[in-house]
């Protein structure tokens, strides 16, 4: 098996959080270039199984070329379809753990043709699955100024969102906005450069999240996980920005918080509504990892188990 240059963030911590059983069945919801998947396979015995999802055909093609392990099943699909696929495979409530790495992989960022990067010029696409949906260029040309501003503010926490949207529409009066560097240039005229952060970071993040409906897909798969996991099954989720982390945090808290106790004494056990999850905490990358891989500095790992 051949790895490319992509470094999986918090590899040992996220896999350790799964508490892997050698004969267990696990899901890697975001295969990418297979770093976490290989880590899971390394801990599984001959009877163990790993099901890996990815909606990027490049990731699936890479997996077919570089992974020959018979314990691995590849699914070309967004992870929001997990419940349907696991049901079809007869594995409902039989999964021992689900791992999600919510970051964009280095090959996606580094390939200018994908449209994720503001560092190299390419078509303004940003779709994880380039065979479906609307590209960033198409959306920016169809959306009005208010819609663009709202997306950049809501999904990017960008305070200058309205000024950016105004500049985008002004640019489009004379030009077609269709390249990454054109968009980055527009944003850079509005947002001041911060230390270690490109002015267009939040805008690109926001448009990517919106185009791919990433937060809706995350909310969907989190709810599905409650039915997919077996008792004591683990959730191990790495997020890279505050919006995703808030969704994961609130999901775990909501489902691990003890409900109000019934009135009256004595309190009978069967009348106490059981919590669905147990919150097993949050973790950050080590200083050593951050020094090797700057992407790790914003990573937050949250872990939970099913009651």
From Swiss-Prot:
Its main location: cytoplasm. Pfam families: Methyltransf_5. Its EC number is 2.1.1.199. GO terms for cellular component: cytoplasm. Keywords: Cytoplasm, Methyltransferase, rRNA processing, S-adenosyl-L-methionine, Transferase. The keyword Nucleotide-binding does not apply. GO terms for molecular function: rRNA (cytosine-N4-)-methyltransferase activity. It is found in: Cytoplasm. The keyword S-adenosyl-L-methionine applies. S-adenosyl-L-methionine binds at residues 34-36, 54, 79, 101, 108. InterPro entries: RsmH, SAM-dep_MeTrfase_MraW_recog, SAM-dependent_MTases_sf. It catalyses: cytidine(1402) in 16S rRNA + S-adenosyl-L-methionine = N(4)-methylcytidine(1402) in 16S rRNA + S-adenosyl-L-homocysteine + H(+). GO terms for biological process: rRNA base methylation. Specifically methylates the N4 position of cytidine in position 1402 (C1402) of 16S rRNA. PANTHER family: 12S RRNA N4-METHYLCYTIDINE METHYLTRANSFERASE (PTHR11265:SF0), S-ADENOSYL-METHYLTRANSFERASE MRAW (PTHR11265). This is Ribosomal RNA small subunit methyltransferase H. It comes from Ruthia magnifica subsp. Calyptogena magnifica. The lineage of its organism: Bacteria, Pseudomonadati, Pseudomonadota, Gammaproteobacteria, Candidatus Pseudothioglobaceae. The gene is rsmH.
């Amino acid at each position: 098996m051949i790895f490319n240059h992509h470094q999986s963030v918090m590899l040992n911590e996220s896999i350790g959080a799964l508490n892997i059983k050698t004969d267990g069945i696990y899901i890697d919801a975001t295969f990418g270039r297979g770093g976490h998947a290989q880590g899971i396979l390394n801990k599984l015995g001959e009877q163990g199984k790993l099901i890996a999802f990815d909606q990027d055909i490049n990731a699936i093609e890479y997996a077919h070329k570089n992974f020959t392990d018979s314990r691995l099943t590849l699914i070309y699909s967004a992870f929001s379809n997990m419940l349907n696929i696991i049901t079809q495979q007869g594995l409902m409530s039989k999964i021992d753990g689900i791992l999600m790495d919510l970051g964009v992989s280095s090959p996606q960022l580094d390939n200018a043709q994908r449209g994720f990067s503001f560092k190299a010029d390419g078509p303004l696409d940003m779709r994880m699955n380039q065979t479906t949906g609307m590209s960033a260029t198409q959306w920016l040309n169809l959306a009005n100024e208010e819609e663009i501003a709202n997306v950049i503010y809501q999904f990017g926490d960008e305070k200058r969102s309205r000024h950016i949207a105004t500049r985008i529409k002004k640019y489009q009066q004379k030009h077609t906005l269709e390249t990454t560097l054109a968009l980055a240039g527009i944003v850079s005229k509005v947002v001041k450069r911060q230390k270690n952060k490109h002015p267009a970071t939040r805008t690109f993040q926001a448009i990517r999240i919106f185009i791919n409906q990433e937060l809706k897909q995350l909310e969907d798969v989190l709810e599905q996980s409650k039915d997919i996991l077996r008792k004591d099954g683990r959730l191990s989720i790495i997020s890279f920005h505050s919006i995703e982390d808030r969704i994961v945090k609130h999901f775990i808290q909501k489902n691990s918080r003890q409900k109000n106790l019934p009135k009256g004494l004595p309190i009978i056990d069967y009348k106490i509504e059981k919590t669905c999850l147990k919150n097993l905490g949050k973790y950050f990358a080590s200083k050593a990892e951050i020094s090797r891989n700057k992407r790790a500095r914003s990573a937050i790992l949250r872990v939970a188990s099913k009651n």
